[in-house]
Amino acid sequence: MLKLVLPKGSLEKSTFELFDAADLSVVRSSSVDYKASVDDPRIDEVRILRPQEIPVYVSEGLFDLGITGRDWIEETSSDVVSLGELKYSKATSQPVRVVVAVANDSAAQSVADLKEGVRVTSEYPEMTRRYFAERGVKADIRLSYGASEAKIPDIADC
């Protein structure tokens, strides 16, 4: 019996359509219900959770299979096997781009120009921490829940 975890949010509708096309309709009592079912004897449990959490839960063995973004697999450093890219993912339609951006009036032209202790805001703090560490830059990494660019230069340097 398989335990599945499917993404809530931007990948939700397309994931449900993918399952529908495979004659495995995902059914839940309301759009805010986190438990669902699929009428198939091979599938025992279906949960709908944030994509950020899915790789961790799959790597811990709480679920057998999950659908999430590659960005969250990398961010969480989860030990999972990626079986492929889905045609509706942002990797294929609107890729996530992680960039280092500074204020227009900044003297920095490259990461090497950033001063020790630079304040960096990111939706991917672990990937960002690794990126700066690999380049020998000591940075104060802060989690951002979106609109990271709006935090420069007052709340963060980049």
Language-model segments: which ranges?
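Domain-level signature for soluble enzymes in the chorismate/prephenate branch of the shikimate pathway
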Residues: 1-158
